[in-house]
């Protein structure tokens, strides 16, 4: 299941009931944040979500209303004694911009990994889903993002029974795992039907009309 929370949709300045641009997703126990405008931390708390599972933060571009909340979020993560590395993804210049913002957050107990987007389109494999970055038409270099999640076929009970596959292996095969036991190999394809239609979420902020969104 993919959970989606639009934390903010405002521009330029935060309003009492409309925080600056930010979107958060949850999948397979990890969270992804796209943009981190001023007040994003408060919006996360208001929605009852948590910053702790965030392992990837993406930026569409580097205008202040899309990134100014990052230093405070990094400090909060550090104060919570985070040890897991954090991956940041954004247009070229990401490391330079974040390094400048970290003047007020110079020491953190976790590693920050930078991935800079250098092509009009780039795809990343992250925690069981694909993240596609695509260039849009803004007055600075700006990207939208698409999350794609493949879905395996449904478990076929009759096939499992007809092939005499031990019941204790069913849940592992459903997860896509291959089991070897007593000289036999059991694969997910033996018990799963045709792949189901996947999930797709596209997020785009500042842009003029562009075909890259439709594609």
Report residues per predicted region:
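Conserved beta-strand hairpin/beta-sheet module of binuclear metal-dependent hydrolase folds
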Residues: 1-47, 83-85, 145-147, 194-203
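Conserved beta-strand segments of alpha/beta enzyme cores
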Residues: 3, 87, 111-113, 130
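Short acidic-hydrophobic surface loop/beta-edge motif
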Residues: 25, 121-126, 179
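A gly/proline- and charged-residue-enriched helix-loop-helix capping module
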Residues: 96-103, 114-119
């Amino acid at each position: 299941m993919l959970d989606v929370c639009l934390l903010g949709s405002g521009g330029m300045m935060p309003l009492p009931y409309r925080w600056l641009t930010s979107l958060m997703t949850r999948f397979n126990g990890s969270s992804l944040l796209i943009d981190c405008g001023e007040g994003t931390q408060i919006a996360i708390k208001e929605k009852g979500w948590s910053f702790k599972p965030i392992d990837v933060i993406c930026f569409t571009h580097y205008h202040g209303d899309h990134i100014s909340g990052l230093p405070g979020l990094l400090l909060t993560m550090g104060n919570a004694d985070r040890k897991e590395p954090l991956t940041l993804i954004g247009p070229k210049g990401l490391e330079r911009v974040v390094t400048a913002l970290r003047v007020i957050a110079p020491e953190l107990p976790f590693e920050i990994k930078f991935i800079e987007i250098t092509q009009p389109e780039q795809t990343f494999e992250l925690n069981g889903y694909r993240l596609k970055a695509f260039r849009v038409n803004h007055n600075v270099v700006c990207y939208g993002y698409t999350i794609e999640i493949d879905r395996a076929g449904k478990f076929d009970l009759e096939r499992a029974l007809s092939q005499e596959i031990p019941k204790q292996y069913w849940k592992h095969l459903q997860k896509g795992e291959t089991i070897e036991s007593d000289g036999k190999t059991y694969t997910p394809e033996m018990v799963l039907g045709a792949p189901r239609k996947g999930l797709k979420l596209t997020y785009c902020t500042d842009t003029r009309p562009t075909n890259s969104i439709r594609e």
